[in-house]
Amino acid sequence: MEVKEMLFMNKGDGENSYVKTSGYTQKVAAVTQPVVYRAAQSLFTGRNSCSYQVLNVADLGCSSGPNTFTVMSTVIESTRDKCTELNWQMPEIQFYLNDLVGNDFNTLFKGLSVIQDKYKNVSCFAMGAPGSFHGRLFPQNSMHLIHSSYGVQWLSKVPKMTSEGGLSPPNKGKIYISKTSPPAVWKAYLSQFQEDFLSFLRCRSPELVPDGRMVLIIHGRKSADPTTRESCYTWEVLADAISYQVSQGLIDEEKLNSFNVPYYIPSQEEVRDLVNKEGSFLTEFVDTIEVELEGIWTGPENGAKNLRSFTEPMISHQFGEEVMDKLYDKVKDILVEDCKQEKQSTRGVSIVLELKKKESHLS
C-alpha cells in the first residue's frame, strides 16, 4: 500500500478522532491567524485586485477538524474588512478543501454549517478537492490564496536508507531520526524532504494567479540538530511503546525494524534554502514560533489521544489493529513517567511562511 493510501487522521467524532483531539493545531491556527489575514488583504493591492468577482482559496491537507473553519473565517473577515475600507463590492469566495482520498470529508462537510450560519450574508462556497499536494491539484492561474497548516512535513514516501555494510536494519528499534540513528538516516530524511518540498513549490507556482499568496505553517525545529528532544519526542515515545510490545511478543521485531514514518521536521534555514532554490516565490514573511502545550499534551491521557488521532491509521496498517489499544495505553504510561521526571515536551515549534509568486514566474 502506498503512503498516500494510509495517511489520514482518525475519522468520525469519537474520543480518539482528530476532530476531538486537534487542540494543538487549533492553537497554532489561532496564533497564525494574523498571517492569513494579512495575506488575504494583500491580494487587494495587486494589479488584478479590482477585477475580482470570485476569490479562489485552497486549504491543502485540511483534514476533518475545525482548523480549516478558522482559516475560512479569517479569509472571509479579512476580505470583508478590506472591501469595506476600499468601498468595493465583496467578491464571492470559493474554498477548495484538499486532502488525500482517505480523509474523512463527510465529517468535514458536516462542520461547514458553522461557516454557513456565521456568514449568512456572505457569498461563499466550499467543495472537496481530493488528491496529493505533492502533484498538481488545480488549473493554471486559478488560485488566489493557498494555505496549508501541518501538512507539508508529511512526505510522499518513506525515505530510502541503507545500513553500513547492509548487515543490520539502518534505523533499528526506531521509527524516526534519533540520537542512536546513523548519519545516513538523517541524510535520507532530509533528501526526501528536499525532493518533496521542491516538488510542492513547483506544483503550486503555476496554480497561483499573478501576485497570488501562499501561507504555510510547518511543524519545525529551532535547532540545527534534528535529534533534539523538541524534534524527536513524539516519535521516540511511540517507538518506545512499540518496542515494549515487541518485548511482550505482541509485535514482531522485524515489523518495527522495517518501519519508518514518512514525516520530516525541518529547520527554518532548510525551508528558506529550498524556497530560494526553487525560485518561484518571494518570502514576504517568515518566523519560527513556539506554542505552549499546557492542557493539550502535558496531560498523559490527552497526549496519548492526540498522538493516536494522527498516527493510528499508519501504525495500525504496519502493526495490526488488534494491538492498538494496548500500544496507546503504553504511550500513556510512558507519558505519565515522563511527566513525573519532567521529561515531557512542553511546547511545539512551527515555521510560518507567507510567500508571493514572483513576476518572473507568471504563467
Curated annotation (Swiss-Prot):
Keyword Transferase among record annotations: yes
- What is this protein called in UniProt? 7-methylxanthine methyltransferase 1
Q: Which UniProt keywords apply?
A: Magnesium, Metal-binding, Methyltransferase, Transferase
Question: What does the similarity note say?
Answer: Belongs to the methyltransferase superfamily. Type-7 methyltransferase family.
Instruction: Paste the cofactor note.
Output: Binds 1 Mg(2+) ion per subunit.
Amino-acid positions noted as binding Mg(2+) in the UniProt annotation, renumbered to this chain: N171, F259, N260
Where on this chain does S-adenosyl-L-homocysteine bind? Y18, C62, N67, D99, L100, S132, F133
